[in-house]
Amino acid sequence: MQRKKTFDSFRRCKVVILSVLMSFCMTAAFAQSGAVKGKVLDELGEPIIGANIVEKGTTNGTITDMDGNYSLTVNDLKKAVLQASFIGYNTIEESVKGRSTVEIKLSPSVVNLGEVVAIGYGTQTRREITGSVANVSEESFNKGITRDASDLLQGKVAGLTITSGSGDVTRGSTMRLRGTSTLQNDQGPLIVIDGIPGGDMSTVAPSDIESISVLKDASSAAIYGSRAAGGVVLITTKRGSGSKTQISYDGYVAFDQMANKPDLMNADEWRGYANSKGLDYSVYDQYGADTDWFDELTRTGVSQNHSISLSGGGSKNNYRASYTYLDRNGIMRDNDMQRHSFRFQFQQRAINDRLRIGLAGSATLTDSHVPNGDNFVLAYSMLPVYPVYNADGSYFTKVNVEYDQGNPVQNQNLNERKNSNVYFYGAGDIQFEIINGLNIKANLYKSRFSNEYSRYDDSRTTVGQGNNGFAQKRNRAWDRNLMEWTLDYNKSFGADEKHKLNAILGYSWEDNTYSYFFAQNRNFLINDLSYNALQSGAGLKTGDVESGKNYYKLISMFARAHYSYDERYMITATVRRDGSSKFGANHKWGTFPSVSAAWGISQEAFMQDVNWINDLKLRAGYGVTGNQDGLQPYKSMELYGMSGIYYDNGNWATSYKISQNANPDLKWESTAMLNIGLDFSLFNGRLGGTIEWYDKRTSDMLYTYKVPTPPYVYDRMQANVGDMKNTGIEVLLNLDVIRNKTFNWNMSLNLSHNKNEITKLSSDLYTTDRIYTGDPWIRGASGVTSHVVEEGRPVGQFFMLECTGIKDGKYIITDLNGDGEISDDDRTYVGDAQPDLTFGWQNNFTWKNWDFSFFFRGTIGNKVLNNPRAAYANNTYLIGTNALDDELTYTMKESSRVCSYYLENGSFIRLDNLALGYTFDTKKINWLDKARLYFAAQNLFVITGYKGLDPEVELFRGESSDTDAGLSPGIEPRQFFPKARTFTLGVNLTF
C-alpha cells in the first residue's frame, strides 16, 4: 500500500510539473535587443575559427567563421556581456556598452583556467576547482570509429584505465579509476549523462557528446554518495545555441582487418610433424585440403556511421535534435551491430530570463549478433587437412577429438545469438530565479531499457544435434523513475566582489524495477522457425521456463558549499545522505562527507613579479564515498528458492527451501580518499599540467562467505568484511612545442602509477584465508586456478607452480616444500597482472588548413598469462588436433600445466590512434559554414615482448564469465576474439 501511495504521489508530481513545463514552453518575454558583430583574434592577431561567443547569463551564442568573424543579436546592447572561449585559450568577458562592433583578443593557455567544467549538480571554472577533476573536450577525443564514450576517452585521463580486450563489436570496454576497490563485479565509475546519474554510455551516440568530465577523488565525487566509490564520469551532450539555425552532418566508412592471428600449423607443417614422429596420418588426410580456419571465420569488416543534427535558437530559447545510424560489422562473420540513436533538447526562457524550462529525450534501438567464442576454440584445434565443405557442398562434420563441437564455419552460419535492445528516456526541468543568485530547480526523468536475447542451435550442427535443435528466448526490462529538487545560491560580495559563495541543497528520489522472462525448448521438427516458435518443440524440461522481478528505491539529501576569495583561497564542503532499500535493516542510511581546499599561489602579491609562472595552485581534499551497485536487491533478507519437484497424490508439486540467509547488517562498501594535487601553467601557457598523489582506502568490502550450518540454514552469506587500499601518483603534462601563425605542435603526456593491496579479508564472524580464482581453461589442466586473493597481496596476484625452464620436453618445476613431489602445495607468487605504470602520449599538429594527430598508449610492468600457448603449443593431442607452429609443439613430452613458464611480460606501447584532416575554405560558399575531410587509423601496431596475440587483455574480467570479475586479470583467454586494425574515411559538414 505504501509503495502504491509513493507511485501515486510521484505521478501527481510529474503531471503538475510537466503541465507547468508545457504551459511555458510557448512563452517568450519581450526584451530590447540589438545586433553586435566583430572578430576574434589570437595573441598574434590571427583570426580564430570556431571560437564560441555567448551572451553571459544566457545560452544565446554563435561561433566564428573561417575569418574569425561573428554576429550575434543580444538582449540589451547597453548591458550585454560577451563571453568568448576557444580550446587552448583563456575565456574572457567583454562588455558591449552599446557598441555594434566588438573585437575580442584571446590569450593562449594550455590549461584553460576560465574553462567551465561540469562537477556534478553544477559547474565551476577550472581556476576555482578544489577537487581532482579531469575534463576532455570534443577536440581531444579519440578519432575514428567509436562505439561509445569510453572509446573517446581511452588513454586520455591519467588514472582511468579503459580496456577493450576483445574484438567483439557488441561488447563494451571496462573502466576502472585509480585501481580496483572491490571484490564485486560492479566496480566501474558512476555514469552521469546531462545531470542524470546511473546512465549507460552505449545509449549516447559519440557525435552527440560535447565534453566528458571525470571526478577522480572522493571530495569531488562525494555528492553522489553511495554510488561513487569507483569515481564519476560526467557526460555533457551538445545543445543548441545562437540565433542561426545550423545543420550538421558527420559521416564515415570504416574497414576492420584482423590485427593479429594465431600462427597455427598449415597442412604441410602438420604433415611434416607427423612424418618426423613416424605417425600414420592417413586416416585424417583424405581430403586434399589446406584450410586456415581463422581465415574462414573472419572477414574485412565494413562499417558506416551517419549523424545529422539540427540546432539553433534565439535570445530566449535554444534547441537541438539529432539522429545517428551506426552499422558496425566486425571481423568475425557472425558479429555485427546496427544502432539507431535519436536525441532532442529544447530550452525556453521567460519572465525576464528568470524562468527556464527544458525538455529532453532520447531513444536508442540496437540489433546485434553476438559471436560464439567456442568457434574460435575450434579454429585453434581443427586440423588444416580438414575441408570446410564436402565434395557435394555439404558441411564437413568429422568429429574433432579434442572438442566435440563440429565444424566452426557450420556453427557460425547456421546457429544464431541475437540481442535486441530498446532504450528511451524523457526528461523535463523547470528552474526559477527567486531573487538574484537564488534558483530553485526541479527535474523529472523516466527511462526504460529492454533487452531481448534469442538463441538457436540448428539441429544440423554438432552443437544442436544432441537436442535436435535448441531454442532460447530471454526478455529483460529495467524501468527507472527519478525526481530531483535543488536550491542553489551564487553571490559575489565585498567592495571589490572578490568574495564568492556558491551553495546548493538537493533532494533526490528514485525507484528502479527489473523484470525478466526466460524460456527454452528443444526437439524441433524443422529449423526454419529458429527461435520464433518455442511452443513447437517437444523437449520441454523442468527449469525451462522462468520469470522474476525485483525493485529497489533510493532517497537522498545532499548539500555543497564553495567559497573563494580573489581566486586565492578556496574551500568546498559536501555531504550526501543516502537511504536505500538494498541495505539491511540496521543500516538503511549512509552519510558521505567531503572537504577540499585550494590555494592559488600565483595570485599572491609575492608572485606577481614571477613572470614565467602564469598559474600555480595547490589542492588538497578528503572525502568518503560508497558502493552499493555490487549489492543486489533483497540480499539482506531470508529468501526461499525452488529445490525440486515431487509427485504427491496424483499431482506434481514444487518443493522450496531457504536459499539465502538474512543479514540485517548488510550495507554499502565505503571508500575514503585523501588527494593532494598541484596545478601549474608556465612560460605564457606553453607548459602546463597537474601532479597528484592519492591514498584510497576501501572498507566493509562485500563478499560471499562460507558459514556453518547450523546455526545458519544456508551455507553461504554475503557480508561486509574486507579492506583494501590503493595509493598512487598521476602526472599530466601539456606542452606547446611550436606556436606561431601557420604551424602549431601541441604535446600531451599522462602517466599514472597505482599500488593495490588487500589489507583484510576476514573477521570474527566471517573468515577465509585465501580466495583462489581464475581458471585459465587449459586443456589437460581444467579446474586449476591461476590467481589468489589474500591479505598483504594485490588483486591480480598470479599464484601457480614456479617453472624455471623445460628440459627434455618436461617442465622443471620448483619443489618448494621439499617433499619430493610436485603438487598444489608447491604453488607460489609468481607475478602481478596490474601494471606499474600506465601512460598516454598525444601529439597534435596544425598547418594552415591541415590537422594531424597521433596517440600512443601503453603499460609497463604487468604480467600476462599466455593461455593459448599453454593450451596449443603442445603435442599431447597431436595428430588428432592442430597446434601452434611453436618450438614447444615439437619438443614437449607432457601435458600442459598452469605454471609460470607461460607468464610473460605484458608491457606494451600501442599506436592507438592516428588522424589526418583537411578543412576547406568555405567563405565563398554562403550556404556552407564548414567542410572537413579526414582519415583515421586505429590500432596500427603494438611494440611488445609478449608472444601471444595481444598483451592488452581484459584487465578486470574473468576468463569465461564475470563471476570473479576483477579478481583474475591478465589472462589471454582461449575464447579470444581477435582485435581489429581499423581505417576510417570521414567527412564533417556544417550548413
Question: Model segments located where?
Answer:
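Exposed, low-structure sequence patches enriched in small/polar residues
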Residues: G506, R560-H562, N750, Q797-I806, ...
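Extracellular/periplasmic, surface-exposed regions of secreted and cell-surface proteins
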Residues: A29, F141, G188, D194, ...
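C-terminal extracellular loops and terminal segments
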Residues: S150-Q154, Q718-K725, Y766-F798, V830-G840, ...
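Flexible glycine-rich, low-complexity coil/linker segments exposed to the extracellular/periplasmic environment
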Residues: P262-D295, P384-Q412, L529-N550, S643-N661, ...
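Short aromatic-centered micro-motifs
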Residues: I53, A84, I191, Y389, ...
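Glycine-rich, aromatic-lined ligand/substrate-binding cores of catalytic
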Residues: D832-V864
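Short, small/polar-rich motifs associated with maturation and membrane association
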Residues: Q2-F344, R349-A350, L355-A360, T364, ...
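C-terminal beta-barrel architecture of Gram-negative outer-membrane proteins
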Residues: G818-G820, F852-L911, L949
